[in-house]
UniProtKB/Swiss-Prot annotation:
InterPro entries in the record: 2-isopropylmalate_synth_dimer, AIPM/Hcit_synth_CS, Aldolase_TIM, IPM_Synthase, LeuA-like_post-cat, LeuA_allosteric_dom_sf, LeuA_N_DRE-TIM, PYR_CT
Known catalytic reactions: 3-methyl-2-oxobutanoate + acetyl-CoA + H2O = (2S)-2-isopropylmalate + CoA + H(+)
Name of this protein: 2-isopropylmalate synthase
Function as written in the Swiss-Prot or TrEMBL entry: Catalyzes the condensation of the acetyl group of acetyl-CoA with 3-methyl-2-oxobutanoate (2-ketoisovalerate) to form 3-carboxy-3-hydroxy-4-methylpentanoate (2-isopropylmalate).
């Protein structure tokens, strides 16, 4: 790179539009959408689509809701010409949908292109020629008058041919190619000259498409250009003002949105931003940006994964995993703080309330995505994401301190493996950590009775070193009685710091899950035990026994009183 890029590159000049109005505008309705996937998108592929893939793409575009679809560049190849004929003769174009075809401003190409449309009910004939100074000098070696003459002559020829094909409802479209690099006064001069030839009316409008064939400046500059044309075009009420942004600077979506605010009625683009070089503007992102603001985009992306897979199959181009709204990772949070915020957001979000969710601009369900992949766990994740995966996938709603405890266990797993931990991985680790049955003390059975004084008495059968033993104890409640019973086989007193219980899932037949936080005298910290059983009391006993086993493991079996465990204790 140059130390001083100013010696090679010049900044794009600002537009003199001191009273611009677009910054104060809001988009309140969708523009007219025109898909150029089958033309601009197709010509930019390593391997252009064959007829079968083009037809598959066309039918999907119709299903999504596009009313204008640029089908081909018929004069460019026999394949494109034949595809247009198949659309017409095969009856594939629904009522209310117009196909568009593109031609350069040359007589032979215009005649060939118009012939491809013979018999169509509705058609848009789109002619273009480059108007920018660099093209006038370098490519065509002509002046302004020469460029305008080409546009006017082409417009006249198109009108003459169209009048010989009255069975078709025609819409004429003209593009000053490289509009973004053309002097505004000259772009206006050429467009107004074409208007004089085509003589549009408010009932029969023409389209002027103003492309950022190459994106040359910031989106506000393009918006200024569009607003200037919007104000100054002759017969503006008889013109559909269209934009065709490319993404060379990475801001095509912003450019299109600001252009609509500046007066554009129509947007041309491709699904997922396919197209020459860095691509056309992405209509999916534009449409769903509108949707996220409560504006009906008039395109249906309810099954966005299906749209993405079809595009990938037809174009042989992958959709990036972080592509807005559709990428595999766009509704995914790995960060611990993000996961915690999303988990809390889902807890308070009501089905009929406005969507207010941390880190998720739209509800994934609206585009056919599930919540399964929203929270994924790697070495950067925190307790919130882990808790969400266990609760959403397995019904385990952990107490907060258990979330903290278990997250460190998961962290060790992801640090060691260096990979993402799936919900299944986390559930398996949870079972291995809290629900294993091979602890020092194995629960066998119990009998709980209430004494005359209101206290509870438990007769607990446990397995220690492959021998069954009976431990008995009394207390103010079942858990207090259980702790007293277990004290006979432990060298240190155990206390229950926290206890929670809830259903594991929904319905009358759901198992119970219990969580007990235990501490022992002389043992640093506390640990959790978890118990699952169809019977709530049994689940609570399993939780306490599980926690005791984890304390015993922490002390290297030092807490287990084996000498007393060789016989029945009471």
């Amino acid at each position: 790179m140059l130390k001083n890029p100013a010696t090679k590159y010049r900044p794009f000049p600002a537009i003199a539009l001191a009273d611009r109005t677009w910054p104060n505008k809001t988009i309140t309705r969708a523009p007219i959408w025109m898909s150029t996937d089958l033309r601009d998108g197709n010509q930019a592929l390593f391997e252009p689509m064959n007829a079968e893939r083009k037809m598959r793409m066309f039918k999907m575009l119709v299903q999504i809701g596009f009313k204008e679809i640029e089908a081909a560049f018929p004069a460019a190849s026999q394949t494109d010409f034949d595809f247009v004929r198949e659309l017409i003769e095969g009856g594939h174009i629904p009522d209310g949908v117009a196909i568009e075809v593109l031609t350069q401003a040359r007589e032979d190409l215009i005649r060939r292109t118009m012939e491809s449309l013979r018999g169509a009910k509705r058609a848009i004939i789109h002619v273009y020629n480059a108007t920018a100074p660099v093209f006038r000098r370098t490519v065509f070696n002509t002046d302004r008058e020469g460029v305008k003459r080409i546009a006017v002559q082409s417009a006249k020829l198109i009108r003459e041919i169209a009048q010989t094909m009255p069975e078709t409802q025609w819409t004429y479209q003209y593009s000053p190619e490289v509009f973004s690099g053309t002097e505004l006064d000259f772009a206006l001069e050429v467009c107004n000259a074409v208007t004089e030839v085509w003589e549009p009316t408010p009932e029969h409008k023409i389209i002027f498409n103003l492309p950022a064939t190459v994106e040359m400046a910031t989106p506000n500059i393009y918006a200024d250009q569009i607003e200037w044309m919007h104000r100054n075009l002759a017969r503006r009420d008889s013109i559909i003002l269209s934009v065709h942004p490319h993404n060379d600077r990475g801001t095509a979506v912003a450019a299109a949105e600001l252009a609509v605010m500046a007066g554009a009625d129509r947007v041309e683009g491709c699904l997922f931003g396919n197209g020459e070089r860095t691509g056309n503007v992405d209509i999916v992102t534009l449409a769903l940006n509108l949707y996220s603001q409560g504006v009906d985009p008039e395109l249906d992306f309810s099954h966005i994964n299906d749209v993405a897979r079809t595009c990938e199959d037809c174009t042989q181009l992958p959709v990036h995993p972080r592509h807005p709204y559709v990428g595999d990772l766009v509704f995914t949070a790995f960060s611990g703080s993000h996961q915690d915020a999303i988990k809390k957001g889902f807890a308070v979000q009501k089905p009929d309330a406005p969507w207010e969710m941390p880190y998720l601009p739209i509800d994934p369900a609206d585009v056919g995505r599930t919540y399964d992949s929203i929270i994924r766990v790697n070495s950067q994740s925190g307790k919130g994401g882990i808790a969400y995966l266990l609760e959403s996938g397995y019904g385990v709603a952990m107490p907060r301190r258990l979330q903290v405890e278990f997250s460190s266990t998961v962290q060790k797993l992801t640090d060691a493996s260096g990979r993402e931990a799936t919900g299944a991985d986390i559930w398996a680790l949870f079972q291995q950590t809290y629900l294993r049955s091979d602890g020092a003390i194995g629960y066998v059975s119990h009998r709980l009775t209430e004494r005359d004084d209101g206290s509870q008495h438990i007769r607990l059968v446990v397995n220690i070193d492959d021998h069954e033993h009976i431990c008995e104890g009394s207390g103010n409640g079942p858990l207090d009685a259980l702790v007293h019973a277990l004290s006979h086989v432990l060298t240190a007193p155990v206390s229950i710091h926290h206890y929670e219980e809830r259903a594991l899932g929904q319905g009358a037949n759901a198992d119970a899950i219990a969580f007990a936080e235990l501490a022992a005298t002389g043992v640093a910290g506390s640990v959790f035990g978890v118990g699952v059983d169809a019977n709530l009391t049994t689940a609570s006993i399993r939780a306490v026994v599980g926690g005791v086993n984890r304390l015993i493991a922490r002390t290297g079996q030092g807490m287990l009183r084996r000498s007393s465990a060789q016989a029945t204790v009471a």
